[in-house]
């Protein structure tokens, strides 16, 4: 019996692919088609493994294989509510008269792990829900949203019926088992409880829409060597979640702020991934804004920046890159991006002294190496011209790595014109034990897609003492674009689950601030056609800056989020 489209989307027997070409061209690759359109920009294709005529071509096609994104969290905390982060951002001040900006009339959408819809922090004073809808991609017992083929959509009416029931989850069986999505939603839009003394979010008057993402398919977890039990989400599911959020408000002509607290180290670190490009396309729409966390990779030693030249000595036409692999690492995927117009080769030396000669795969190719005395396997995939960036990309997939120092010898072919190359290891949570560069760079460590051109990408600081958060990602982008845009509080931030410290909370605070601005601009018709790029630049003009720091810089971007400063800048103060 043929499996339906929903079955293909959910089954590990079917591969997912992200394409930007007409679906008719897929006849060259597979006989049957099941696909989802992403706003006319991309198609997500689902096809059986046995239907694929050339399986290796699928995995070599870098952009077609969905990347995996992890939660930008670093563990929960304890402690009650305090408004320090909101005050430092000027958010509490503009909640008060005369501006009275609470996000009223604005929709904040959290694309994440779901939400605890029963918590009072997501209810109105009369006990009804402030959540307009939940698209739970993991629940298949109900009806999907219009235009989508999997999951179940729960409306505000459904949620209110559940809240009146003795067993709410028998009516709306959507839970946030991890708590990350609930934390973000509470920081961005949590209700004012007990007059704001017990809890309040940045935009307590905003409505909420939630997308609960399904976890990645096992074949992708295996391909990227992500440990079992670690939350990991597919790029295409996130894209469809963003599309749902964008489209939900269209019938109501409501402004929307989309908050993404996830990230990855896969990609060219210029915002050119399919997700990054799609987020930028949404962000330039009127009455839309997209806020993305900058990640927690700044202190992880997961980035190496190298420079080759023709002069000999340090930085000559060859460079040894050493990677320390601790005991217990199941595997890792590492990427090298080589700058135009140079061509690079890679040789490998294991901790046991076995070697792989310099690898050069031509236009596109893949080769796997095994060793005599070590059980490790190394698969090298090369793209001489990565289609969007135009630069050389080499992906190294290392399975069962021997603990110790791995040496990757990077060499340029022929005369060197630029000589720069960058390498990234996976985000920390995608490693079963530490793996890191012995000579790392803390810069260009913002996670994708925070470097997408039109989104608001933020780094993280501690509002208690105005210090930069040591784990926060740092800019700029690989091509030198100014990222982050600014920093927002993300240390000891009160959430519905206790205090937390990570970049996703900085993004949530910023999303709430954006909702405040959209209330003033769109709902109150002071600038009804504003979009993400304009809001970003208003916020940049109002950001707090220290007199002894040069801006923009790699840590702070243009300064610290300051809503009072933003409105002062509007009136010329």
Annotate each predicted stretch with a short phrase:
Residues 66-68, 240-270, 293-294, 411-413:
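Short acidic, glycine-rich surface-loop motifs adjacent to enzyme active sites
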């Amino acid at each position: 019996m043929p499996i339906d489209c929903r079955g293909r989307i959910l089954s590990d027997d079917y591969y997912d692919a992200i394409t930007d070409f007409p679906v008719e061209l897929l006849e060259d690759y597979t006989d049957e088609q099941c696909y989802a359109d992403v706003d006319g920009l991309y198609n997500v294709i689902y096809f059986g493994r046995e239907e694929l005529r050339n399986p290796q071509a699928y995995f070599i096609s870098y952009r077609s294989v969905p990347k995996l994104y992890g939660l930008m969290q670093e563990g929960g905390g304890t402690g009650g509510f305090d408004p320090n982060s909101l005050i430092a951002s000027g958010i509490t001040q503009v909640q008060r008269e005369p501006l009275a900006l609470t996000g009223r009339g604005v929709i904040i959408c959290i694309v994440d792990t779901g939400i605890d819809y029963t918590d009072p922090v997501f209810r109105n004073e009369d006990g009804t829900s402030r959540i307009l809808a939940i698209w739970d991609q993991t629940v298949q017992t109900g009806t999907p949203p219009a235009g989508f083929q999997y999951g179940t959509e729960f409306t505000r009416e459904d949620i209110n019926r559940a809240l009146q029931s003795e067993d709410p989850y028998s009516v709306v069986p959507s839970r946030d088992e991890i708590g990350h999505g609930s934390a973000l939603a509470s920081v961005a839009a949590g209700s004012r409880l007990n007059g704001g003394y017990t809890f309040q979010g940045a935009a307590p008057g905003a409505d909420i829409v939630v997308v609960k993402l399904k976890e990645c398919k096992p074949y992708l977890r295996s391909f990227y060597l992500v440990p079992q039990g670690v939350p990991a989400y597919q790029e295409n599911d996130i894209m469809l979640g963003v599309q749902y959020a964008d489209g939900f408000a269209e019938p109501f002509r409501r402004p929307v702020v989309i908050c993404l607290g996830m990230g990855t180290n896969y990609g060219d670190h210029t915002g050119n991934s399919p997700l990054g490009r799609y987020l930028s396309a949404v962000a330039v729409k009127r009455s839309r804004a997209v806020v993305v966390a900058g990640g927690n990779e700044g202190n992880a030693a997961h980035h190496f920046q190298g420079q080759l030249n023709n002069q000999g000595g340090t930085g000559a036409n060859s460079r040894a890159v050493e990677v320390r692999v601790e005991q217990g690492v199941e595997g890792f995927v590492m990427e090298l991006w080589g700058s135009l117009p140079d061509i690079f080769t890679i040789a490998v030396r294991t901790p046991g002294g076995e070697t792989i000669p310099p690898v050069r795969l031509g236009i596109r190719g893949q080769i796997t190496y095994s060793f005599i005395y070590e059980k490790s396997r190394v698969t090298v995939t090369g793209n001489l011209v990565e289609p969007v960036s135009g630069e050389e990309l080499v992906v190294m997939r290392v399975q069962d790595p021997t603990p110790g120092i791995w040496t990757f010898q990077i060499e340029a072919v022929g005369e060197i014109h630029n000589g720069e190359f960058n390498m990234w290891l996976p985000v920390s949570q995608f490693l079963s034990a530490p793996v890191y560069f012995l000579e790392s760079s803390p810069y260009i460590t913002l996670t994708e897609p925070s470097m997408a051109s039109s989104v608001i990408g933020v780094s993280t600081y501690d509002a208690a003492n105005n210090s930069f958060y040591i784990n926060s990602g740092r800019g700029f982008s690989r091509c030198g674009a100014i990222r982050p845009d600014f920093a927002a509080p993300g240390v000891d931030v009160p959430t519905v689950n206790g205090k937390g410290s990570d970049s996703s909370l900085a993004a949530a605070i910023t999303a709430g601030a954006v909702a405040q601005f959209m209330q003033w601009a769109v709902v109150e018709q002071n600038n009804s056609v504003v979009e993400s790029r304009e809001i970003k630049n208003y916020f940049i003009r109002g950001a707090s800056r220290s007199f002894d720091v040069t801006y923009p810089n790699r840590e702070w971007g243009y300064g610290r989020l300051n809503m009072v400063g933003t409105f002062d800048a509007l009136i010329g103060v």
